[in-house]
């Protein structure tokens, strides 16, 4: 693998899984610790469950992150109507899918304007149009997550539909549109 993506934002882990990514100094400390033990590029994956994602991204960049990926899942919860108990063993856990795309897009836009390192956009991406929107918002690359759980061929289908979608919107080269919405 050519790089390491360090998830400082997992809401599904007891005992600090998300807490590393909710405070700028804690995220920076993790970034420095990982950078100290590898020569590979380090990408820090951020949580949307914060008040100011820009300050956290900047702290990671200042600590040596080679890139920022965002967003991880949003904190969510469901209750079983029969048992009246939380469905998720941890009570709360990661909520993902198309519903979080607008939040992810906003955060990619904000962070990409604030940092100089590459930004990888993710969160609710399920179509070639979503990829183009992410790139217009400032993502230099895009990841697909939850869509692959619904359709194991989602990533392949998105890549295959990109040329037609690019033509539809008059896009010759994807890299030319990065940050085009700024």
Description of each model-found segment:
Residues 175-182:
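A short, charged, Gly/Pro-tolerant segment at domain boundaries
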Residues 1-120, 126-144:
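Alpha/beta enzyme core
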Residues 125-129, 151, 182:
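Small/polar glycine-rich anion-binding or flexible loop at a beta-alpha turn
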Residues 116, 136-139, 163, 167, ...:
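Hydrophobic alpha-helix feature that most strongly marks membrane-spanning transmembrane helices
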Residues 79-93, 135, 147-172:
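C-terminal helical cap(s) of enzyme catalytic domains, especially alpha/beta-barrels
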């Amino acid at each position: 693998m050519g790089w390491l993506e360090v998830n400082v934002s997992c809401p599904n882990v007891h005992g600090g899984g998300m807490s590393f990514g909710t405070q700028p100094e804690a995220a920076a400390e993790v970034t420095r610790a990982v950078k100290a033990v590898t020569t590979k590029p380090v990408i820090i994956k951020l949580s949307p469950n914060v008040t100011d994602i820009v300050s956290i991204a900047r702290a990671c960049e200042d600590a040596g992150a080679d890139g920022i990926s965002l967003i991880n899942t949003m904190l969510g919860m469901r209750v079983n109507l029969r048992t009246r108990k939380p469905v998720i063993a941890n009570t709360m856990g990661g909520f993902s899918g198309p519903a979080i795309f607008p939040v992810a897009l906003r955060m990619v836009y904000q962070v990409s304007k604030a940092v100089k390192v590459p930004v990888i956009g993710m969160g609710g991406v399920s179509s070639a149009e979503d990829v183009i929107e992410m790139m217009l918002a400032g993502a230099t690359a895009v990841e697909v997550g939850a869509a692959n759980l619904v359709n194991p061929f989602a990533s392949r289908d998105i890549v295959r539909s990109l040329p037609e979608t690019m033509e539809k919107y008059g896009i010759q080269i994807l890299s030319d549109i990065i940050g085009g919405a700024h």
